[in-house]
Amino acid sequence: MRRNRRGSPARPAARFVRPAIPSALSVALLVCTPGLATADPQTDTIAALIADVAKANQRLQDLSDEVQAEQESVNKAMVDVETARDNAAAAEDDLEVSQRAVKDANAAIAAAQHRFDTFAAATYMNGPSVSYLSASSPDEIIATVTAAKTLSASSQAVMANLQRARTERVNTESAARLAKQKADKAAADAKASQDAAVAALTETRRKFDEQREEVQRLAAERDAAQARLQAARLVAWSSEGGQGAPPFRMWDPGSGPAGGRAWDGLWDPTLPMIPSANIPGDPIAVVNQVLGISATSAQVTANMGRKFLEQLGILQPTDTGITNAPAGSAQGRIPRVYGRQASEYVIRRGMSQIGVPYSWGGGNAAGPSKGIDSGAGTVGFDCSGLVLYSFAGVGIKLPHYSGSQYNLGRKIPSSQMRRGDVIFYGPNGSQHVTIYLGNGQMLEAPDVGLKVRVAPVRTAGMTPYVVRYIEY
Protein backbone atom coordinates (compact mmCIF):
# COMPACT_ATOMS: atom_id res chain seq x y z
CA MET A 1 0.00 0.00 0.00
CA ARG A 2 2.91 2.32 0.56
CA ARG A 3 5.11 3.63 -2.17
CA ASN A 4 8.76 2.77 -2.43
CA ARG A 5 10.57 5.61 -0.76
CA ARG A 6 13.04 5.76 -3.61
CA GLY A 7 11.46 8.11 -6.11
CA SER A 8 12.23 10.88 -8.55
CA PRO A 9 9.88 12.98 -10.65
CA ALA A 10 12.68 13.64 -13.14
CA ARG A 11 12.65 10.87 -15.74
CA PRO A 12 11.79 7.18 -16.05
CA ALA A 13 15.42 6.09 -15.90
CA ALA A 14 15.92 7.65 -12.49
CA ARG A 15 16.17 5.38 -9.47
CA PHE A 16 14.01 5.73 -6.39
CA VAL A 17 16.17 7.66 -3.91
CA ARG A 18 14.75 8.84 -0.62
CA PRO A 19 14.98 12.66 -0.83
CA ALA A 20 16.04 13.02 2.78
CA ILE A 21 19.06 10.69 2.40
CA PRO A 22 21.94 12.28 0.44
CA SER A 23 23.10 10.17 -2.48
CA ALA A 24 26.67 9.49 -3.49
CA LEU A 25 26.27 11.85 -6.45
CA SER A 26 25.07 14.75 -4.31
CA VAL A 27 27.94 14.28 -1.90
CA ALA A 28 30.38 14.07 -4.80
CA LEU A 29 29.10 17.36 -6.21
CA LEU A 30 29.72 19.02 -2.86
CA VAL A 31 33.21 17.58 -2.64
CA CYS A 32 34.55 17.82 -6.14
CA THR A 33 35.27 21.56 -6.25
CA PRO A 34 38.11 22.92 -8.43
CA GLY A 35 40.27 23.62 -5.43
CA LEU A 36 40.21 19.99 -4.29
CA ALA A 37 41.16 18.35 -7.55
CA THR A 38 44.94 18.79 -7.21
CA ALA A 39 45.80 16.46 -4.30
CA ASP A 40 45.46 12.90 -5.51
CA PRO A 41 45.89 11.20 -2.10
CA GLN A 42 43.30 13.49 -0.57
CA THR A 43 41.00 12.96 -3.54
CA ASP A 44 41.30 9.19 -3.18
CA THR A 45 40.57 9.43 0.53
CA ILE A 46 37.54 11.62 -0.03
CA ALA A 47 36.28 9.31 -2.78
CA ALA A 48 36.53 6.35 -0.42
CA LEU A 49 34.68 8.27 2.29
CA ILE A 50 31.98 9.24 -0.19
CA ALA A 51 31.58 5.55 -0.97
CA ASP A 52 31.27 4.78 2.75
CA VAL A 53 28.49 7.35 3.15
CA ALA A 54 26.72 6.04 0.05
CA LYS A 55 26.92 2.47 1.34
CA ALA A 56 25.52 3.49 4.72
CA ASN A 57 22.65 5.34 3.05
CA GLN A 58 21.97 2.36 0.79
CA ARG A 59 21.78 0.02 3.79
CA LEU A 60 19.28 2.38 5.38
CA GLN A 61 17.27 2.43 2.15
CA ASP A 62 17.34 -1.36 1.95
CA LEU A 63 16.01 -1.50 5.49
CA SER A 64 13.26 0.95 4.53
CA ASP A 65 12.29 -1.37 1.67
CA GLU A 66 12.13 -4.29 4.10
CA VAL A 67 9.76 -2.33 6.34
CA GLN A 68 7.48 -1.58 3.39
CA ALA A 69 7.52 -5.24 2.38
CA GLU A 70 6.52 -6.28 5.90
CA GLN A 71 3.62 -3.83 5.95
CA GLU A 72 2.45 -5.04 2.55
CA SER A 73 2.60 -8.67 3.69
CA VAL A 74 0.18 -7.85 6.51
CA ASN A 75 -2.18 -5.93 4.21
CA LYS A 76 -2.21 -8.80 1.73
CA ALA A 77 -2.81 -11.31 4.52
CA MET A 78 -5.89 -9.35 5.59
CA VAL A 79 -7.27 -9.39 2.04
CA ASP A 80 -6.59 -13.13 1.77
CA VAL A 81 -8.54 -13.78 4.98
CA GLU A 82 -11.45 -11.70 3.71
CA THR A 83 -11.49 -13.59 0.40
CA ALA A 84 -11.26 -16.98 2.12
CA ARG A 85 -14.09 -16.14 4.51
CA ASP A 86 -16.26 -14.94 1.63
CA ASN A 87 -15.57 -18.20 -0.21
CA ALA A 88 -16.42 -20.20 2.91
CA ALA A 89 -19.71 -18.34 3.33
CA ALA A 90 -20.60 -18.95 -0.32
CA ALA A 91 -19.74 -22.64 0.03
CA GLU A 92 -21.96 -22.93 3.10
CA ASP A 93 -24.82 -21.36 1.14
CA ASP A 94 -24.30 -23.89 -1.67
CA LEU A 95 -24.27 -26.70 0.88
CA GLU A 96 -27.58 -25.55 2.34
CA VAL A 97 -29.11 -25.42 -1.14
CA SER A 98 -27.85 -28.94 -1.88
CA GLN A 99 -29.16 -30.28 1.41
CA ARG A 100 -32.59 -28.80 0.72
CA ALA A 101 -32.49 -30.40 -2.74
CA VAL A 102 -31.78 -33.80 -1.17
CA LYS A 103 -34.76 -33.37 1.17
CA ASP A 104 -36.96 -32.41 -1.78
CA ALA A 105 -35.74 -35.45 -3.74
CA ASN A 106 -36.49 -37.76 -0.82
CA ALA A 107 -39.97 -36.29 -0.54
CA ALA A 108 -40.52 -36.80 -4.28
CA ILE A 109 -39.43 -40.43 -4.00
CA ALA A 110 -41.77 -41.01 -1.06
CA ALA A 111 -44.70 -39.53 -3.01
CA ALA A 112 -43.89 -41.53 -6.15
CA GLN A 113 -43.46 -44.73 -4.13
CA HIS A 114 -46.81 -44.13 -2.43
CA ARG A 115 -48.56 -43.67 -5.78
CA PHE A 116 -46.90 -46.79 -7.14
CA ASP A 117 -47.84 -48.89 -4.08
CA THR A 118 -51.44 -47.67 -4.22
CA PHE A 119 -51.71 -48.45 -7.91
CA ALA A 120 -50.14 -51.90 -7.51
CA ALA A 121 -52.44 -52.81 -4.62
CA ALA A 122 -55.54 -51.70 -6.52
CA THR A 123 -54.51 -53.69 -9.58
CA TYR A 124 -53.84 -56.82 -7.52
CA MET A 125 -57.08 -56.64 -5.52
CA ASN A 126 -59.48 -55.66 -8.26
CA GLY A 127 -57.94 -56.83 -11.49
CA PRO A 128 -59.45 -55.62 -14.75
CA SER A 129 -62.92 -54.22 -14.17
CA VAL A 130 -64.24 -56.04 -17.23
CA SER A 131 -62.78 -59.13 -18.95
CA TYR A 132 -62.85 -59.94 -22.61
CA LEU A 133 -64.70 -63.19 -21.90
CA SER A 134 -67.56 -61.53 -20.10
CA ALA A 135 -68.06 -58.84 -22.73
CA SER A 136 -71.57 -59.03 -24.21
CA SER A 137 -71.11 -56.60 -27.09
CA PRO A 138 -68.46 -55.05 -29.35
CA ASP A 139 -68.70 -51.78 -27.40
CA GLU A 140 -67.91 -53.62 -24.20
CA ILE A 141 -64.85 -55.22 -25.84
CA ILE A 142 -63.62 -51.82 -27.04
CA ALA A 143 -64.14 -50.37 -23.56
CA THR A 144 -62.19 -53.26 -22.04
CA VAL A 145 -59.26 -52.79 -24.45
CA THR A 146 -59.22 -49.05 -23.77
CA ALA A 147 -59.26 -49.61 -20.02
CA ALA A 148 -56.38 -52.07 -20.32
CA LYS A 149 -54.30 -49.63 -22.35
CA THR A 150 -55.03 -46.83 -19.90
CA LEU A 151 -54.11 -49.07 -16.99
CA SER A 152 -50.84 -50.06 -18.67
CA ALA A 153 -49.95 -46.45 -19.50
CA SER A 154 -50.74 -45.37 -15.97
CA SER A 155 -48.59 -48.15 -14.57
CA GLN A 156 -45.67 -47.17 -16.81
CA ALA A 157 -46.03 -43.50 -15.85
CA VAL A 158 -46.02 -44.28 -12.14
CA MET A 159 -42.93 -46.46 -12.51
CA ALA A 160 -41.17 -43.83 -14.66
CA ASN A 161 -41.87 -41.13 -12.09
CA LEU A 162 -40.49 -43.32 -9.35
CA GLN A 163 -37.34 -44.07 -11.36
CA ARG A 164 -36.87 -40.38 -12.21
CA ALA A 165 -37.24 -39.41 -8.57
CA ARG A 166 -34.63 -41.99 -7.58
CA THR A 167 -32.21 -40.71 -10.26
CA GLU A 168 -32.70 -37.12 -9.11
CA ARG A 169 -31.99 -38.17 -5.54
CA VAL A 170 -28.71 -39.79 -6.60
CA ASN A 171 -27.72 -36.60 -8.45
CA THR A 172 -28.67 -34.29 -5.60
CA GLU A 173 -26.89 -36.47 -3.05
CA SER A 174 -23.77 -36.38 -5.24
CA ALA A 175 -24.03 -32.59 -5.52
CA ALA A 176 -24.51 -32.33 -1.78
CA ARG A 177 -21.40 -34.40 -1.11
CA LEU A 178 -19.41 -32.17 -3.47
CA ALA A 179 -20.81 -29.05 -1.82
CA LYS A 180 -19.85 -30.44 1.59
CA GLN A 181 -16.31 -31.08 0.39
CA LYS A 182 -16.07 -27.55 -0.99
CA ALA A 183 -17.48 -26.08 2.21
CA ASP A 184 -15.02 -28.05 4.34
CA LYS A 185 -12.11 -26.97 2.13
CA ALA A 186 -13.26 -23.34 2.14
CA ALA A 187 -13.52 -23.39 5.93
CA ALA A 188 -10.04 -24.91 6.17
CA ASP A 189 -8.70 -22.27 3.75
CA ALA A 190 -10.28 -19.52 5.83
CA LYS A 191 -8.70 -20.92 8.98
CA ALA A 192 -5.33 -21.22 7.23
CA SER A 193 -5.60 -17.64 5.95
CA GLN A 194 -6.45 -16.40 9.43
CA ASP A 195 -3.49 -18.30 10.86
CA ALA A 196 -1.26 -16.78 8.17
CA ALA A 197 -2.52 -13.28 8.96
CA VAL A 198 -1.92 -13.79 12.67
CA ALA A 199 1.56 -15.11 11.91
CA ALA A 200 2.24 -12.11 9.66
CA LEU A 201 1.16 -9.69 12.38
CA THR A 202 3.24 -11.45 15.01
CA GLU A 203 6.30 -11.72 12.76
CA THR A 204 5.96 -8.10 11.70
CA ARG A 205 5.95 -6.98 15.31
CA ARG A 206 9.11 -9.00 15.98
CA LYS A 207 10.86 -7.70 12.87
CA PHE A 208 9.92 -4.11 13.61
CA ASP A 209 11.55 -4.45 17.02
CA GLU A 210 14.72 -5.77 15.38
CA GLN A 211 14.64 -3.20 12.59
CA ARG A 212 14.25 -0.35 15.05
CA GLU A 213 17.53 -1.38 16.67
CA GLU A 214 19.10 -1.87 13.25
CA VAL A 215 18.13 1.65 12.21
CA GLN A 216 19.93 3.08 15.21
CA ARG A 217 23.05 1.06 14.43
CA LEU A 218 23.06 1.99 10.74
CA ALA A 219 22.33 5.62 11.56
CA ALA A 220 25.36 5.70 13.85
CA GLU A 221 27.50 4.22 11.07
CA ARG A 222 26.12 6.75 8.60
CA ASP A 223 26.77 9.67 10.96
CA ALA A 224 30.31 8.48 11.64
CA ALA A 225 31.02 8.11 7.91
CA GLN A 226 29.55 11.55 7.23
CA ALA A 227 31.66 13.08 10.00
CA ARG A 228 34.84 11.50 8.60
CA LEU A 229 33.95 12.77 5.15
CA GLN A 230 33.41 16.29 6.40
CA ALA A 231 36.70 16.26 8.30
CA ALA A 232 38.54 15.13 5.17
CA ARG A 233 36.88 17.85 3.11
CA LEU A 234 37.91 20.49 5.64
CA VAL A 235 41.50 19.25 5.57
CA ALA A 236 41.55 19.34 1.78
CA TRP A 237 40.03 22.82 1.73
CA SER A 238 42.48 24.12 4.33
CA SER A 239 45.46 22.68 2.44
CA GLU A 240 44.42 24.77 -0.53
CA GLY A 241 44.55 27.91 1.59
CA GLY A 242 40.84 28.18 2.08
CA GLN A 243 39.63 31.32 3.82
CA GLY A 244 36.26 32.33 5.21
CA ALA A 245 33.39 29.89 5.13
CA PRO A 246 33.95 26.51 3.44
CA PRO A 247 32.52 26.33 -0.10
CA PHE A 248 30.33 23.39 0.93
CA ARG A 249 27.50 22.88 3.36
CA MET A 250 28.59 21.85 6.83
CA TRP A 251 26.79 18.71 7.92
CA ASP A 252 25.18 18.67 11.37
CA PRO A 253 23.40 15.44 12.44
CA GLY A 254 20.92 17.53 14.40
CA SER A 255 20.03 20.02 11.71
CA GLY A 256 18.05 17.83 9.34
CA PRO A 257 18.80 16.78 5.78
CA ALA A 258 21.05 18.92 3.64
CA GLY A 259 19.19 21.93 2.37
CA GLY A 260 16.19 21.08 4.54
CA ARG A 261 14.71 22.27 7.80
CA ALA A 262 15.34 20.96 11.26
CA TRP A 263 12.83 18.41 12.47
CA ASP A 264 10.95 18.31 15.73
CA GLY A 265 13.04 15.58 17.30
CA LEU A 266 10.27 12.96 17.28
CA TRP A 267 11.85 11.14 14.36
CA ASP A 268 14.67 11.74 11.91
CA PRO A 269 13.30 12.10 8.35
CA THR A 270 16.64 10.94 6.94
CA LEU A 271 15.98 7.52 8.48
CA PRO A 272 13.41 4.82 7.66
CA MET A 273 10.23 5.24 9.70
CA ILE A 274 9.80 1.95 11.58
CA PRO A 275 6.19 1.55 12.78
CA SER A 276 5.82 1.29 16.53
CA ALA A 277 4.98 -2.18 17.81
CA ASN A 278 1.63 -1.29 19.31
CA ILE A 279 -0.36 -4.19 17.88
CA PRO A 280 -2.91 -5.31 20.51
CA GLY A 281 -2.07 -8.45 22.47
CA ASP A 282 -4.45 -10.69 20.51
CA PRO A 283 -3.64 -10.66 16.75
CA ILE A 284 -6.88 -12.55 16.02
CA ALA A 285 -8.77 -9.60 17.46
CA VAL A 286 -6.91 -7.33 15.04
CA VAL A 287 -7.85 -9.56 12.09
CA ASN A 288 -11.51 -9.70 13.11
CA GLN A 289 -11.62 -5.95 13.72
CA VAL A 290 -10.15 -5.17 10.30
CA LEU A 291 -12.46 -7.64 8.55
CA GLY A 292 -15.47 -6.30 10.42
CA ILE A 293 -14.65 -2.84 9.10
CA SER A 294 -14.19 -4.33 5.63
CA ALA A 295 -17.62 -6.01 5.71
CA THR A 296 -19.25 -2.73 6.73
CA SER A 297 -17.29 -0.97 4.00
CA ALA A 298 -18.67 -3.36 1.37
CA GLN A 299 -22.24 -2.60 2.43
CA VAL A 300 -21.54 1.14 2.40
CA THR A 301 -20.14 0.79 -1.13
CA ALA A 302 -23.28 -1.01 -2.31
CA ASN A 303 -25.53 1.63 -0.73
CA MET A 304 -23.60 4.49 -2.33
CA GLY A 305 -23.59 2.69 -5.67
CA ARG A 306 -27.38 2.38 -5.63
CA LYS A 307 -27.69 6.03 -4.66
CA PHE A 308 -25.38 7.11 -7.49
CA LEU A 309 -27.26 5.04 -10.08
CA GLU A 310 -30.52 6.46 -8.75
CA GLN A 311 -29.20 10.00 -9.18
CA LEU A 312 -28.35 9.15 -12.78
CA GLY A 313 -31.89 7.80 -13.24
CA ILE A 314 -30.68 4.34 -14.28
CA LEU A 315 -31.17 2.33 -11.07
CA GLN A 316 -32.80 -1.05 -11.78
CA PRO A 317 -34.71 -3.13 -9.20
CA THR A 318 -32.11 -5.89 -9.51
CA ASP A 319 -29.09 -3.60 -8.98
CA THR A 320 -26.92 -4.57 -6.01
CA GLY A 321 -25.20 -1.21 -6.06
CA ILE A 322 -21.80 -2.72 -6.88
CA THR A 323 -20.84 -1.22 -10.24
CA ASN A 324 -17.50 -2.94 -10.95
CA ALA A 325 -17.04 -4.46 -14.37
CA PRO A 326 -17.53 -8.25 -14.21
CA ALA A 327 -14.53 -10.49 -14.76
CA GLY A 328 -13.42 -10.47 -18.38
CA SER A 329 -15.48 -7.38 -19.22
CA ALA A 330 -14.33 -3.81 -19.68
CA GLN A 331 -17.76 -2.29 -19.09
CA GLY A 332 -19.22 -2.05 -15.61
CA ARG A 333 -22.69 -1.06 -14.51
CA ILE A 334 -21.95 2.63 -15.16
CA PRO A 335 -22.68 3.33 -18.86
CA ARG A 336 -19.95 5.11 -20.84
CA VAL A 337 -22.21 8.10 -21.34
CA TYR A 338 -22.04 8.72 -17.58
CA GLY A 339 -18.40 7.65 -17.21
CA ARG A 340 -16.85 11.12 -17.14
CA GLN A 341 -19.41 12.28 -14.58
CA ALA A 342 -18.65 9.25 -12.41
CA SER A 343 -14.89 9.76 -12.74
CA GLU A 344 -15.15 13.40 -11.68
CA TYR A 345 -17.25 12.38 -8.68
CA VAL A 346 -14.52 9.92 -7.66
CA ILE A 347 -11.87 12.63 -7.90
CA ARG A 348 -13.93 15.16 -5.92
CA ARG A 349 -14.50 12.56 -3.22
CA GLY A 350 -10.80 11.82 -2.96
CA MET A 351 -9.77 15.48 -3.04
CA SER A 352 -12.10 16.19 -0.12
CA GLN A 353 -9.66 14.23 2.08
CA ILE A 354 -6.59 16.39 1.38
CA GLY A 355 -4.82 17.05 4.67
CA VAL A 356 -6.01 13.83 6.36
CA PRO A 357 -3.02 12.03 7.93
CA TYR A 358 -1.51 8.80 6.69
CA SER A 359 -2.50 5.72 8.71
CA TRP A 360 -1.23 2.27 7.76
CA GLY A 361 -4.30 0.09 7.18
CA GLY A 362 -6.60 3.09 7.59
CA GLY A 363 -9.52 4.13 5.42
CA ASN A 364 -12.69 2.44 4.18
CA ALA A 365 -15.71 3.23 2.03
CA ALA A 366 -17.19 5.47 4.72
CA GLY A 367 -14.07 7.59 5.26
CA PRO A 368 -10.83 7.72 7.26
CA SER A 369 -10.41 5.18 10.05
CA LYS A 370 -7.87 3.87 12.52
CA GLY A 371 -5.38 1.47 10.99
CA ILE A 372 -3.10 -1.20 12.38
CA ASP A 373 0.25 -1.04 14.16
CA SER A 374 1.61 2.49 13.57
CA GLY A 375 -1.84 3.50 12.28
CA ALA A 376 -3.75 2.09 15.26
CA GLY A 377 -3.87 5.47 16.96
CA THR A 378 -4.36 7.57 13.83
CA VAL A 379 -7.61 8.17 11.96
CA GLY A 380 -6.60 8.46 8.34
CA PHE A 381 -5.85 6.66 5.08
CA ASP A 382 -3.10 4.61 3.60
CA CYS A 383 -2.65 4.70 -0.17
CA SER A 384 -5.05 1.90 -1.12
CA GLY A 385 -7.52 2.97 1.55
CA LEU A 386 -7.79 6.39 -0.10
CA VAL A 387 -8.37 4.84 -3.54
CA LEU A 388 -10.92 2.42 -2.05
CA TYR A 389 -12.79 5.34 -0.45
CA SER A 390 -12.75 7.48 -3.59
CA PHE A 391 -14.22 4.84 -5.92
CA ALA A 392 -16.72 3.53 -3.36
CA GLY A 393 -18.71 6.71 -3.97
CA VAL A 394 -19.88 5.33 -7.32
CA GLY A 395 -20.29 1.74 -6.13
CA ILE A 396 -16.92 0.38 -7.26
CA LYS A 397 -15.81 -2.12 -4.63
CA LEU A 398 -12.03 -2.44 -4.23
CA PRO A 399 -9.93 -4.53 -1.83
CA HIS A 400 -7.74 -2.76 0.71
CA TYR A 401 -4.46 -3.79 -0.94
CA SER A 402 -2.80 -2.08 -3.89
CA GLY A 403 -1.59 -5.37 -5.42
CA SER A 404 -5.17 -6.65 -5.59
CA GLN A 405 -6.47 -3.32 -6.91
CA TYR A 406 -3.96 -3.59 -9.76
CA ASN A 407 -5.63 -6.79 -10.96
CA LEU A 408 -9.08 -5.20 -11.30
CA GLY A 409 -10.37 -2.91 -14.04
CA ARG A 410 -8.74 -2.52 -17.46
CA LYS A 411 -5.01 -2.03 -17.87
CA ILE A 412 -3.95 0.90 -20.05
CA PRO A 413 -0.34 1.73 -21.09
CA SER A 414 0.90 4.39 -18.69
CA SER A 415 1.74 6.63 -21.65
CA GLN A 416 -2.00 6.78 -22.42
CA MET A 417 -3.30 7.49 -18.91
CA ARG A 418 -5.99 10.11 -18.48
CA ARG A 419 -7.69 11.88 -15.61
CA GLY A 420 -9.31 9.38 -13.24
CA ASP A 421 -7.00 6.46 -14.04
CA VAL A 422 -5.16 4.78 -11.18
CA ILE A 423 -1.34 4.71 -11.05
CA PHE A 424 0.56 1.87 -9.39
CA TYR A 425 4.14 1.47 -8.21
CA GLY A 426 6.32 -1.53 -7.46
CA PRO A 427 6.14 -5.15 -8.68
CA ASN A 428 2.55 -5.88 -9.73
CA GLY A 429 1.43 -2.65 -8.08
CA SER A 430 2.29 -3.92 -4.62
CA GLN A 431 4.01 -0.84 -3.16
CA HIS A 432 1.90 2.24 -3.81
CA VAL A 433 -1.21 3.47 -5.62
CA THR A 434 -2.45 6.95 -6.57
CA ILE A 435 -5.20 8.60 -8.65
CA TYR A 436 -4.15 10.54 -11.74
CA LEU A 437 -5.58 14.07 -11.88
CA GLY A 438 -4.17 15.15 -15.23
CA ASN A 439 -1.49 17.74 -16.04
CA GLY A 440 1.18 15.59 -14.44
CA GLN A 441 -0.46 15.61 -11.00
CA MET A 442 -1.76 12.81 -8.80
CA LEU A 443 -3.66 12.39 -5.53
CA GLU A 444 -2.04 10.16 -2.91
CA ALA A 445 -1.77 9.16 0.73
CA PRO A 446 2.03 9.09 0.66
CA ASP A 447 3.70 7.75 3.78
CA VAL A 448 3.96 7.67 7.56
CA GLY A 449 4.13 11.18 9.00
CA LEU A 450 2.63 12.79 5.88
CA LYS A 451 -0.90 13.69 4.79
CA VAL A 452 -3.15 13.14 1.79
CA ARG A 453 -1.90 15.51 -0.90
CA VAL A 454 -1.63 16.40 -4.57
CA ALA A 455 1.88 15.75 -5.90
CA PRO A 456 3.70 15.55 -9.24
CA VAL A 457 3.51 12.14 -10.87
CA ARG A 458 6.63 10.08 -10.20
CA THR A 459 7.61 7.88 -13.11
CA ALA A 460 10.39 5.95 -11.35
CA GLY A 461 9.04 2.64 -10.13
CA MET A 462 5.72 3.07 -11.94
CA THR A 463 4.15 -0.06 -13.40
CA PRO A 464 3.97 -0.25 -17.23
CA TYR A 465 0.19 0.06 -17.01
CA VAL A 466 -2.31 2.20 -15.18
CA VAL A 467 -5.75 0.80 -14.37
CA ARG A 468 -9.05 2.22 -15.61
CA TYR A 469 -12.08 1.36 -13.49
CA ILE A 470 -14.50 3.72 -15.27
CA GLU A 471 -14.88 3.84 -19.05
CA TYR A 472 -15.93 6.92 -21.01
From Swiss-Prot:
SUPFAM superfamilies: Cysteine proteinases. It is found in: Secreted. Gene3D superfamilies: 6.10.250.3150, endopeptidase domain like (from Nostoc punctiforme) (3.90.1720.10). The active site is at C383, H432, E444. MoxR1-mediated folding is critical for secretion via the TAT system. The synergistic effects on peptidoglycan degradation of RipA plus RpfB are inhibited by addition of PBP1A (ponA1). Keywords: Cell wall biogenesis/degradation, Hydrolase, Protease, Secreted, Signal, Thiol protease. The keyword Cell wall biogenesis/degradation applies. The keyword Cell wall biogenesis/degradation applies. Its EC number is 3.4.-.-. It holds the Pfam family NLPC_P60. NCBIfam families: NlpC_p60_RipA (NF033741). This is Peptidoglycan endopeptidase RipA. It comes from Mycobacterium tuberculosis (strain ATCC 25618 / H37Rv). The lineage of its organism: Bacteria, Bacillati, Actinomycetota, Actinomycetes, Mycobacteriales.
